[in-house]
Amino acid sequence: MTHSTRILLGVNIDHVATLRQARGTRYPDPVKAALDAEEAGADGITVHLREDRRHIQERDVLLLKDVLQTRMNFEMGVTEDMLAFAERIRPAHICLVPETRQELTTEGGLDVAGQEARIKAAVERLAKIGCEVSLFIDADERQIAASKRVGAPAIELHTGRYADAQTPTEVAEELQRVADGVAFGLAQGLVVNAGHGLHYHNVEAVAAIKGINELNIGHALVAHALFVGFKAAVAEMKALIVAAAR
C-alpha cells in the first residue's frame, strides 16, 4: 500500500444497505450507490460485512468486487468465518476492525497491543493471498507501534472521539490527538488513513492534517444524499477535503 500524493476519499456505502435491510427490499442498491460515488470522484468504496449481516451482504461484496473501477476497502472482524470469506474472494484491500453485536456502529479501535499474536496471524494469512491490510485503531502510540510490529502496512485512525467532542477545548484536544497519531504513524513507516463520525462540518480540520492518505466517510454522505442526491453529496465532500488538504 503506497501513500497517495493527494488526499483520497473512501466512500462507505454501508448505510445504503441499512436502508434496504430495514424493509428487506431489493432497493436502494448499494452497488448502484458505489458506482454513482465513483462517478462523483470517490477514490475507493468501503464496505463492512458484519457478523450479524445488519447491512452489507455477501452478494453485495461479490458484485462490488466485479464492477468497481476504483478499489474496494473490505472491512471485517478478525474471525475465522471472515478470514475464510476473505480468502475466497481475495479483495485487494482489507481493514480489520473490532466488532460487537450490540453496538450501533464501530465504537472504538482494534486492540492490537492486547492481542498481537492473533492480529499478526490474521495479517500474515491475508498477506499470503495478496491482500494489503490496514488496522482500524485509536490514535494511540501504543496501538500504532503494535500495528507496525504485527506487519500491517497501513492503519486507519479512529476519529470518533474528535467527532463526538462537545466543547472547543475537547475538539482541539481530540484533533491534536489525531494529528499526533498521524505523525507517529508516518514515523513508523505506515500509510495513515482516518475516519469515523466525519461530516461536512468537522472534516476540514482533519483533512488539513499533513500526511493523511485517505478519509473514509459514510453516514454523513448517505444522510446528505437524501436532500441533494448521492453524486452531489460525494462531490461536495470530495471538494471539501481536497481544498482543506492543500
Swiss-Prot record:
Pathway: Cofactor biosynthesis; pyridoxine 5'-phosphate biosynthesis; pyridoxine 5'-phosphate from D-erythrose 4-phosphate: step 5/5. SUPFAM superfamilies: Pyridoxine 5'-phosphate synthase (SSF63892). GO terms for molecular function: pyridoxine 5'-phosphate synthase activity. Gene3D superfamilies: Aldolase class I (3.20.20.70). The keyword Transferase applies. 3-amino-2-oxopropyl phosphate binds at N12, R23, G197, G218, H219. The active site is at H48 (proton acceptor), E75 (proton acceptor), H196 (proton donor). Catalyzes the complicated ring closure reaction between the two acyclic compounds 1-deoxy-D-xylulose-5-phosphate (DXP) and 3-amino-2-oxopropyl phosphate (1-amino-acetone-3-phosphate or AAP) to form pyridoxine 5'-phosphate (PNP) and inorganic phosphate. Homooctamer; tetramer of dimers. Keywords: Cytoplasm, Pyridoxine biosynthesis, Transferase. This is Pyridoxine 5'-phosphate synthase. It comes from Pseudomonas syringae pv. syringae (strain B728a). The gene is pdxJ. Disulfide bonds: none annotated. GO terms for biological process: pyridoxine biosynthetic process. 1-deoxy-D-xylulose 5-phosphate binds at D14, H15, R50, H55, T105. One of its GO terms (cellular component) is cytosol.
